[in-house]
């Protein structure tokens, strides 16, 4: 691969990243995103070099740039994915692992899914959250989907960390897979202490027309905190038992009047 010398602007971005030394800062990510968009062969070359650097900060940045190169996020697929594959089996630094999880997700590496599922019990809640976010949503239209993906999501939706449960429940609510185990998991999450997780569970149960989800949903629609997902779940259920609570919401709920009107019509 012929590599052109880096431009002055590229050099400025790399130098700024070196100076900031903070992989979580917005300023660092402004430079990472800029380098991704530039997406030249010189950006690729520097990213690949940083991926093999002894410094975990550099490795994390290198992987983060490789994750989405070019305007379409998929430039230099062979070079980028080859490096990502070589790293997932050996990397031990937590920050680099989180960057690798994102790279596996954005590059759509199906061979990286077993590695993702292996991280579901990782002691770092940030890594478990990234796994819940990155796992492909199981779909019966794609029978090649690893069965372990669904099992991992079921495990993560019972994670002690709320944001992990939220993402895992979100994925379960969207999958077209259905089973008693999935329904029981969603019913459990419908009573979760976390508001967002409860909301995602309500939609998942509505998508499956699960009768046991209706009574709790009525209660949530009558509460003083009603999110759009609860109203969306009511629209999906289209059950007359939900209509009185929806009609009562017209007195004060102004988040999405059109959605509320559709839900009332569906339940009429």
What are these regions (language model features)?
Residues 121-123, 127-130, 134, 142:
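Extended amphipathic alpha-helical coiled-coil/heptad-repeat regions
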Residues 247-268:
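Eukaryotic acidic, Ser/Thr-rich intrinsically disordered low-complexity regions
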Residues 137-140, 162, 167-174, 184, ...:
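Alpha-helical adaptor scaffolds
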């Amino acid at each position: 691969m012929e590599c052109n010398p880096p431009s002055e602007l590229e050099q400025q971005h790399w130098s700024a990243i070196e100076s900031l030394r903070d992989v979580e800062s917005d300023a660092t990510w402004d430079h990472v995103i800029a380098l991704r968009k530039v997406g030249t062969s010189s950006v690729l070359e520097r990213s690949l070099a940083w991926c093999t650097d002894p410094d975990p900060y550099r490795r994390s940045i290198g992987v983060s740039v490789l994750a989405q190169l070019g305007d379409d996020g998929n430039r230099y697929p062979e070079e980028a994915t080859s490096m990502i594959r070589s790293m997932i089996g050996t990397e031990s630094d937590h920050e680099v692992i989180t960057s690798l999880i994102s790279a596996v997700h954005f590059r759509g590496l199906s061979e990286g899914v077993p590695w993702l599922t292996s991280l579901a019990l990782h002691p770092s809640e940030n890594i478990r959250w990234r796994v819940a976010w990155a796992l492909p949503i199981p779909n019966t239209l794609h029978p090649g989907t690893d069965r372990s993906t669904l099992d991992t999501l079921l495990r993560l939706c019972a994670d002690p960390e709320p944001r992990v449960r939220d993402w895992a429940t979100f994925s379960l609510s969207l999958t077209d897979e259905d089973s008693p185990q999935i329904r029981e998991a969603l019913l459990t999450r419908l009573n979760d202490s976390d508001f967002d997780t409860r909301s995602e569970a309500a939609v998942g149960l509505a998508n499956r027309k699960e009768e046991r989800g209706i009574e709790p949903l009525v209660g949530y629609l009558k509460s003083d905190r009603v999110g759009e997902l609860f109203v969306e779940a009511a629209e999906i259920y289209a059950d007359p038992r939900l209509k009185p609570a929806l009609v009562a919401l017209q007195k004060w709920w102004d988040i999405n009047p059109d959605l509320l009107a559709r839900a009332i019509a569906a339940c009429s």
